[in-house]
């Protein structure tokens, strides 16, 4: 998992509340358990004017010119600005996979659905909760300023606007540690690889009959 320390990126404003996981990545794309291939279908039913299907060449599909991520000014955005209850609906890890693969490193909103919030940390996507008034101010600046960027400093737990105004945000210390060091569940386990190896050796020595079929 890519570490997240400090990131400055172009902001895309998704001015919709209660965006659910089926809107983030529609159900027909959930057949795969691989973590790749979902970025092109992020917000599929909003980005395109037709119905998407797995394996289809998206480069030939008609784009929805009224959807924010299709606006030229937001191409290459890596910070998603959203409204309350982002990521609600069914539990699907594919949602943060799609956001991450599209290029978003962080999502800023007044609130998130609990399961989406937890899944985001496990996949290297930083969900930041700010006060609604602060999010409103960011929307206003983003919508009126082309090329609007924000800087997110995870170590300092601050979001800095182009005018120098900063907002602090809370994050669990363990989740912060994992993101700063690029540790997912597998990475955390591998930190104890030596201890696991010693246990396996001792276990095999104490109960060799359990491993007979593996000889």
Swiss-Prot record:
Associated pathway: Amino-acid biosynthesis; L-leucine biosynthesis; L-leucine from 3-methyl-2-oxobutanoate: step 2/4
A Pfam short name: Aconitase_C
InterPro entries noted in UniProt: 3-IsopropMal_deHydase_ssu, Aconitase/3IPM_dehydase_swvl, AconitaseA/IPMdHydase_ssu_swvl, IPMI_Swivel, LeuD
GO molecular function: 3-isopropylmalate dehydratase activity
Catalysed reaction equations from the record: (2R,3S)-3-isopropylmalate = (2S)-2-isopropylmalate
Enzyme Commission number(s) from the entry: 4.2.1.33
Keywords: Amino-acid biosynthesis, Branched-chain amino acid biosynthesis, Leucine biosynthesis, Lyase
Enzyme class: lyase
GO BP: L-leucine biosynthetic process
GO cellular component: 3-isopropylmalate dehydratase complex
Function per UniProt: Catalyzes the isomerization between 2-isopropylmalate and 3-isopropylmalate, via the formation of 2-isopropylmaleate.
HAMAP family: LeuD_type1
Family, as annotated: Belongs to the LeuD family. LeuD type 1 subfamily.
Record note on quaternary structure: Heterodimer of LeuC and LeuD.
Name this protein carries in UniProt: 3-isopropylmalate dehydratase small subunit
Originating organism: Xanthomonas axonopodis pv. citri (strain 306)
Gene encoding the protein: leuD
